[in-house]
UniProtKB/Swiss-Prot annotation:
The gene is mycbp. It comes from Dictyostelium discoideum. It comes from the Eukaryota. GO terms for biological process: regulation of DNA-templated transcription. Belongs to the AMY1 family. Its main location: nucleus. It is found in: Nucleus. GO terms for molecular function: transcription coactivator activity. Keywords: Nucleus. This is c-Myc-binding protein homolog.
Amino acid sequence: MQNSAEKEEFKGYLEKSGVIDALTKVLVGLYEESDKPSDALEFIKKHLGNSLGIDVDALKQENADLKAEVSALTQRVDDLSKKLEAANKQ
């Protein structure tokens, strides 16, 4: 169990690093929502990322695009490897 000095030190760390402020802003935003979201945790994740200047939807799209590109390049490597193998057999 942590002693009170350790807890105060950790609290100070969270305040100095902006964590408390960011969490407070997101929770206030959730509180002020007229239509409460069905998934409060998803709201917090999305808006916490936004408060840090991160566009979660854009990152998800970029991730999907990169996965598709990796898949296409993997297929191309496989195709070229087969061609090289066939050429080396001749």
